[in-house]
Design a protein with these regions (language model features):
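Hydrophobic faces of well-ordered beta-strands that scaffold small-molecule active sites
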Residues: 7-11, 54-56, 96-102, 125-131, ...
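Long, repeat-rich segments with strong aromatic
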Residues: 229-239, 244-245
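Acidic (Asp/Glu)-rich catalytic clusters
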Residues: 2-4, 44-48, 86-94, 120-126, ...
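Hydrophobic or amphipathic alpha-helical targeting/insertion segments
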Residues: 92, 97-143, 149-152, 157-161
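Active-site mouth loops of central-metabolism enzymes
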Residues: 22-37, 101-110, 146-152, 214-227, ...
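N-terminal beta1-alpha1-beta2 module of alpha/beta enzyme domains
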Residues: 1-92, 215-218
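An alpha-helical appendage that flanks or caps ligand/catalytic pockets
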Residues: 2-18, 152-215, 245-306
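Conserved, mostly hydrophobic/aromatic
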Residues: 9, 46, 50, 89, ...
Length: 306
């Protein structure tokens, strides 16, 4: 009897919906983007449905170029920092994975290592890091840059960034902390490893002042579809958000990415590739279609022209 493959399911979530008009529904909860109790309720409901992970949408910037237009469809204009949010959600859930984005273009490796190791401890081994290099100059301007560095340069930096973070997570071996009170030894020095990294982009001595994350390494997500992005994913990722405007394109992306893994010493089964679908929810099909029609009819011309 052949074994059945398990489909990986997750929820990517924006509090007022991904459609620019979703917030206009009378049932939309106005304060949801900054209401942690709302998120806890939503994720507990999701957990009851047995998905594998929850992933809040994020971008580290407000759109400032045309506020009069963005007020019509304010996607990403009001949202909490995702790692902090997931830490609050962790205590209200028990088994759903908790994923967040942190950009290798804007963070420092030591900070990312600490943040996701902490989330992994808080959630008892449910953290996931979505590794991105970012794609928008408007976000770069919040981090001392006029514009993003060139694409290939960003990915070279991302590779080094990832190696540092993974090395910091390996500062301590799993059984390094022994708490031997009789001999006054909290940890075994032989199981403490200083990274002492010096590379093209970063100089990080280490090590991480936190016990090894419960998973060893939090789950690694990526979404890059460029050549550099696919190379990094084939080398490092465990889950990739796939692309493709058609079934044939999705199949080609799947085969391409899986086919790159052998040169990095990895088996294709070590990587899951997920396709995205936007869902309009209603008590029945008619209600869902009416909701979709309402959204479409209420797309403001200012948003359509952005």
């Amino acid at each position: 009897m052949s074994s059945r493959k398990k489909m990986v399911l997750g929820g990517l979530f924006e509090a007022n919906g991904y459609h620019s008009s979703a917030w206009l529904l009378p049932s939309a909860q106005d304060r949801a983007p900054t209401d942690v109790d709302y998120f806890r309720r939503i994720v507990r409901m999701a957990e009851d449905g047995q998905p594998d992970f929850f992933f809040p949408a994020d971008t580290p910037a407000a759109r400032t170029e045309n506020p009069d237009a963005w007020t019509r469809g304010p996607l990403y204009m009001n949202m909490m920092e995702p790692i902090t949010l997931l830490s609050a959600i962790a205590g209200a859930t028990s088994h759903i994975g908790l994923g967040a984005t942190a950009s290798t273009s804007f963070y420092e490796p030591y900070n990312v290592a600490r943040l996701f190791a902490s989330l992994d401890h808080i959630s008892h081994g449910r953290a996931a890091w979505n590794v991105v290099t970012s794609a928008n100059d408007y976000a770069a301007r919040n981090f001392g840059l006029d514009r993003l560095p060139p694409h290939d340069r960003r990915y070279a930096k991302a590779r080094e960034f990832f190696e540092i973070v993974r090395g910091l997570w390996d500062t301590w071996e799993d059984d390094a902390f022994i708490y031997d009170k009789a001999n006054v030894r909290m940890f075994d020095p032989e199981k403490f490893h200083v990274l002492d990294h010096e590379g093209e982009f970063f100089k990080v001595h280490g090590g991480l002042n936190m016990a090894r994350p419960p998973q060893g390494s939090p789950v690694i997500f990526q979404a890059g579809a460029s050549e550099a992005g696919k190379e990094l994913a084939a080398e490092t990722a465990e889950v990739v958000f796939g692309t493709g405007a058609s079934r044939d394109e999705a199949i080609q992306f799947y085969r391409d990415l899986k086919g790159r893994m052998a040169k990095f010493g990895r088996h294709p089964d070590e990587l899951k590739i997920l396709s995205g679908v936007s869902i309009v929810v209603g008590e029945n099909e008619q209600q869902a279609r009416e909701k979709w029609a309402f959204w479409q009819e209420n797309v403001h011309i200012d948003i359509g022209l952005l």
